[in-house]
């Protein structure tokens, strides 16, 4: 009072700090963050309590929203009417709340971002589940405080008989902090609470067996559980939510992508607009039409696809470039005793259980107090009825009611309340039937009092009541999960946008590489002339050719024993007759380094092995997983002697047989058990003993049903059943597999084949031919074979690859390998 009316100098820095802290705490505690107990912010709590006070229960009629907003403003929330109405609208939107607590009548907005109609037009009342939020509020279950002007009382928190914080979630931005809690399935959350009540030591992982993850009102698909687990364990995490889609195929073969569910809080109209913009800007091609066919029966966005486009590729592009796939950042921040805390899943459930214990205890105490008060009155009535004549005489002899009351209290030892109840007793209660009712009521009350006292004395009974009442709510309001949870995928990258299909990859002697669709080459009869596979320079020719899938890892092994990796789709696609791209633009090769072997694999595992064979007959086996981390600059796959180079690479299972074939027609078969696994940089061991001037042209891994097919440089070939090659010990000289002559020329390659397979041959002029293996007769090891490809003049067969066109599944899972030696070097060694 001494400083009233005076101007006091203060330090502006200190005053700003104080005022800002006061403002920040006001926003945090009184506006932006939900209470962990009822999951509500103050404005939502005041709206529900005001509607409860107005009697807007589900069985009653709707009331104008302007009336509700006015009541909230006038009694509890002296802020802007638009903010209160906006909060009321959100409580009624079934695309915002998993379980709406307000039943809105009129235009309350839409998932397209349409605003609600003005509050003077809309009406509302409480939803049935909202009654569970305020149930027992009149039984002193929660504390009340004065409102802003001290003329009313408002609850500090609602009893919230279901865990609203998790069930409906919450979002808000305070000062220096924000909360974003996703909604969940009511039944799952109640099951989680039940588990925690029964087993307080339950881990978060065990709780996740009941609470699978967020359950959004707009459904959608959550991709993976890692983000969910992180959020549940730490209170923070990020999940990926994807739209639900399906591809419809019409009778004419035309395809449509149908979107029926979108990620939570995504504006549908803006989503459709963003797709249209991508098509307009030609960032996505292949979409012929786009329309929104959503109606009162549900959401339906139709994306029509052009006939020559792939629906799956377009869908993945849409996931990448639009909010058909969105992220939801979880930050489970809530007020605990008016202090903001980041809570994990178990802590939220524990706080709710603790709060419900208080609610049940206070309700029980209220019921006990009320029952005890009634029992006290009944005890007085019983005394009066037992002495009815004396009571009547005393009352009749009293001059005033007060005198009668005091007389009853004095004569029968009654309390003031008991005496007043006797005076208020109607004469009809003096009948025998009424006296019996009073006796029965008293006996029932004594049982109730005993039960209430036993509840207060036993915490387990309180927990049992919480569990039973929650299960009743689950049975009444529970529903099926809307949001599906699917296996996690890696972040969408270019691979998701590439159609998986079989392709032919060719690599020339000069290092030109390209990718071509496998169906470009049509099958021809044995001995045909072939078609032009590619255009090569006069001094260049195709050296490597193999079949693979666009999504496979392509491992390139060089003559120096180094290896590199590319995805098949990273190899540029070109026309059949095009030259291709020089491999030095894709791989960091040394000047004297050239690709000598190529292998295609889907993934790097620890159960499979890479078996490598060199020109000098050295063999090495290494676990595939050891080559997982391949640098862009490559790494050493095998150490070589100065006069040796790498020839072949195959994938094995650890107990396969191996066949090595030489240029002069010799072959050896042995089991890879004879070759112990070695490290990446090891040299290897002897696989075959070579004659002078002989060298290895290929290595294969046979099975019992396959045939060994060898091809000579002059276009001759032969099939021999693998059974004719008996197993020997590693390091032997081998057996004759092909009698080479000037007519046939020496061998250039070997493949394991079966009926149904196809063979592709290519010569040094780039001419290719595709042959059915069944057209090649099976002969003995010593036979000369048949003509597979007619060559003119100096033409020489250089490369071969096996193709299994009819079995696409096998192609996708296969690990096809193709390799060819430097033809000029091979010829010089002959």
Swiss-Prot record:
Predominant cellular place of this UniProt entry's protein: cytoplasm
Compartments where located: Cytoplasm
UniProt motif GyrA-box: location: 524-530
GO molecular function, one term: ATP binding
Reactions it catalyzes: ATP-dependent breakage, passage and rejoining of double-stranded DNA
UniProt enzyme class: isomerase
CDD domains named among the record's database cross-references: TOP4c
Active-site residue numbers: 121 (o-(5'-phospho-dna)-tyrosine intermediate)
GO biological process, one term: DNA topological change
Pfam families the UniProt entry points to: DNA_gyraseA_C (PF03989), DNA_topoisoIV (PF00521)
UniProtKB keywords: ATP-binding, Cytoplasm, DNA-binding, Isomerase, Nucleotide-binding, Topoisomerase
Function: A type II topoisomerase that negatively supercoils closed circular double-stranded (ds) DNA in an ATP-dependent manner to modulate DNA topology and maintain chromosomes in an underwound state. Negative supercoiling favors strand separation, and DNA replication, transcription, recombination and repair, all of which involve strand separation. Also able to catalyze the interconversion of other topological isomers of dsDNA rings, including catenanes and knotted rings. Type II topoisomerases break and join 2 DNA strands simultaneously in an ATP-dependent manner.
Family: Belongs to the type II topoisomerase GyrA/ParC subunit family.
Subunit structure: Heterotetramer, composed of two GyrA and two GyrB chains. In the heterotetramer, GyrA contains the active site tyrosine that forms a transient covalent intermediate with DNA, while GyrB binds cofactors and catalyzes ATP hydrolysis.
Note: Few gyrases are as efficient as E.coli at forming negative supercoils. Not all organisms have 2 type II topoisomerases; in organisms with a single type II topoisomerase this enzyme also has to decatenate newly replicated chromosomes.
Protein name: DNA gyrase subunit A
The organism of origin for this protein: Clostridium acetobutylicum (strain ATCC 824 / DSM 792 / JCM 1419 / IAM 19013 / LMG 5710 / NBRC 13948 / NRRL B-527 / VKM B-1787 / 2291 / W)
